[in-house]
Amino acid sequence: MHLVGTVETGVGAASRSLAPLLSIIREASSLKDLQPATLNVRLSSPYVLRPTFTIFGSEVGRDEDFHFEVCSIHDLKRVRAFLGVIMRTSTNYHGDDVLEVMAEVNLRERMGLADGSSVELSLFD
């Protein structure tokens, strides 16, 4: 499955919220250099996450659960892709039409993205 969306600025809460959980997320995803920042991608229609793994808030002293789906993010200008995860909390602050994407690189910098840039993601069955 492929999703296409537009990059937009987030509120910065994910980086602060995910930093203490980063070692758990890295272990569960096998992405050893995963960065705590997320890239917000707005879709034209809602997407219901199909979690690859979940970190339950009750197990890490949090009020919400953290759901993750493995994906790849495509840099169409340079014909390459980065493995990553889509993160969504159980409270789903942004709604189903925004994805928060994490990767082992800063996606904005590495892919030369700005607000309004188009991004393609591939999801695995």
Language model segments and positions:
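Short, charged beta-turn/beta-strand-edge "cap" motif at the junction between a beta-strand
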Residues: L123-D125
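Active-site scaffold segments
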Residues: D97-A103
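Long, compositionally biased stretches
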Residues: M1-G95, D115, V119-L121
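Short alpha-helix capping/helix-loop boundary micro-motifs
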Residues: A103-E109
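A short glycine-leucine-enriched loop at secondary-structure breakpoints
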Residues: R110-A114
